[in-house]
From Swiss-Prot:
It is found in: Cell membrane. NCBIfam families: PRK13682.1-1, PRK13682.1-3, PRK13682.1-4. It is a multi-pass membrane protein. Belongs to the UPF0391 family. The chain crosses the membrane at residues 4-24, 28-48. GO terms for cellular component: plasma membrane. Keywords: Cell membrane, Membrane, Transmembrane, Transmembrane helix. This is UPF0391 membrane protein IL0696. The lineage of its organism: Bacteria, Pseudomonadati, Pseudomonadota, Gammaproteobacteria, Alteromonadales. It holds the Pfam family DUF1328. InterPro entries: DUF1328. It comes from Idiomarina loihiensis (strain ATCC BAA-735 / DSM 15497 / L2-TR).
Length: 57
């Protein structure tokens, strides 16, 4: 699960960079939403991983 969160976080970061940079101005709002959703998912996944202990990825 952590792998997918990292993949989608990377996609969201790229989309956010393009959206915030003015290249895709119409998609900036969507990129911001996706970016923040995946930041939250990443944080949740990280906390769950830390609480589980030393299990393999």
């Amino acid at each position: 699960m952590l792998r997918w969160v990292l993949i989608f976080l990377a996609v969201a970061v790229v989309a956010a960079i393009l959206g915030f940079g003015g290249i895709a101005g119409t998609a900036a709002g969507i990129a911001k939403i996706i970016f923040y959703i995946f930041i939250i998912l990443f944080a949740i996944s990280l906390v769950v991983r830390l609480l589980q202990g030393n299990k393999r990825l």
